[in-house]
Amino acid sequence: MKNINPTQTSAWQALQKHYDEMKDVTIAELFANDSDRFAKFSATFDDLMLVDFSKNRITEETLAKLQDLAKETDLAGAIKSMFSGEKINRTEDRAVLHVALRNRSNTPIIVDGKDVMPEVNAVLEKMKTFSQAIISGQWKGYTGKAITDVVNIGIGGSDLGPFMVTEALRPYKNHLTMHFVSNVDGTHIAEVLKKVNPETTLFLVASKTFTTQETMTNAHSARDWFLKSAGDEKHVAKHFAALSTNAKAVGEFGIDTANMFEFWDWVGGRYSLWSAIGLSIILSVGFDNFVELLSGAHAMDKHFSTTPAEKNLPILLALIGIWYNNFFGAETEAILPYDQYMHRFAAYFQQGNMESNGKYVDRNGNAVDYQTGPIIWGEPGTNGQHAFYQLIHQGTKMVPCDFIAPAITHNPLSDHHQKLLSNFFAQTEALAFGKSREVVEQEYRDQGKDPAQLEHVVPFKVFEGNRPTNSILLREITPFSLGALIALYEHKIFTQGAILNIFTFDQWGVELGKQLANRILPELGDDKAISSHDSSTNGLINRYKAWRA
């Protein structure tokens, strides 16, 4: 990968001038001037996904200039570097190969002179065998009963991805009940343990190093709870498995290392659901559906790595995001899935995007003077409409939104889905075109009211519109289409990081807080007043000690 400051390119300068021409152009004008706008600014993927980006403040010239930026920053070279196994995570000297985990073509992918695919396939096969034993009931707990509940203990990528996918694919789930514990707050593990039976529960401890503070604290609490019933430590092996690479620590915990599922340092945590970290997904929906998830992602990988940039969906969405973030000053993006099963999708890509591209230092080690990662947030529709859409429609912030919905629902109750989708379509239309003063006044006249007498209310009912959105319509949310959708967003994030000259695959920002917490923890062990920090931190710690006494 080349280290090119995007603001120093001629394409960036051209975009700055173009922004001056575009800043007052409205989406309504763009549609009025081009009857073929939807056809020009939308694309389908495998007849499974329609991406409509026509309701954006862009023209063909805008996209051409953004594509020039991608060329000048050598995006094509960056894509080749990632897929070829080059160590593009330079601060940790690691390759970035989540694409290898779903490489259904089995084409060799070389890291340090070694094809990684045989090991990837071996772990997949091991997960298949293990999961089939659990799901079939062949695997027995310490009293001879089959497993009924699975508790995944992890945090960050070891929790968010599997939790999001098992929820999104709930229509495909089997008889096993899944639980996820992440927070070191004891309430989280305590509430889950109230729901499960030690005789029929399997715990998955997801920590690459088997040293993650939150995960291991919860794992030891789960082990202690289990042993209160099981008694003999030899029974731990029948109820705990590890997603880790630290065989020594796994064995010391009491887990049979035959039930340790490894992954590699070229798998980043927030890109790890495709790896052994996805074992909870397999246990929830079955191995065949997990393979479909991998296959959908692999199909998007092929699209991303082979499709010309002008028709490449992750690249197009990434470029539009850069346009708003760096030229319009939009600091945020909302992800709004109109599907209740997808209720964790925004939270998943909140981590995926903000931990990846929330960087202020470029690949040369210099502070940037432009915008990098946006703030990502969102909730399912239509809940959000009754919560925060007010600000999106009439607030002072520009909030570009991604609306996501399936054409076919898994629960065709009455006319629920038509009502849901009517809102999905209506919101993007309302955000784009708004409602003028003239329309508001005409509505009053149609109701037999005199607009002049209601003059004081009219301004509050006007919608400026011109609020940008993308619409992603899936045929149906299946393991395959979900895999493709996740990979679409992953590659969008990678594209933005590559163009913005930052390292997308490290996360040093999480380290300082950990270090300070490790320093503070021993100070909380007694009731002595603390004076070793700033006055605020000292005051907080000392009040905590006073109140807990």
UniProtKB/Swiss-Prot annotation:
Pathway: Carbohydrate biosynthesis; gluconeogenesis; Carbohydrate degradation; glycolysis; D-glyceraldehyde 3-phosphate and glycerone phosphate from D-glucose: step 2/4
Record's keyword terms, sorted: Cytoplasm, Gluconeogenesis, Glycolysis, Isomerase
Gene Ontology process terms (BP): gluconeogenesis; glucose 6-phosphate metabolic process; glycolytic process
EC number: 5.3.1.9
Active site, renumbered: E355, H386, K514
Compartment annotation: Cytoplasm
One Gene Ontology CC term in the entry: cytosol
Endpoints of the signal sequence: none
Keyword flag Cytoplasm: yes
Domain of life according to the entry: Bacteria
InterPro entries for the chain: G6P_Isomerase, G6P_Isomerase_C, Phosphoglucose_isomerase_CS, SIS_dom_sf, SIS_PGI_1, SIS_PGI_2
Pfam families documented for this protein: PGI
GO molecular function, one term: carbohydrate derivative binding
Catalytic function, reaction form: alpha-D-glucose 6-phosphate = beta-D-fructose 6-phosphate
Role description: Catalyzes the reversible isomerization of glucose-6-phosphate to fructose-6-phosphate.
Protein family per UniProt: Belongs to the GPI family.
NCBIfam families membership: PRK00179.1
HAMAP family: G6P_isomerase
Name of the molecule in the record: Glucose-6-phosphate isomerase
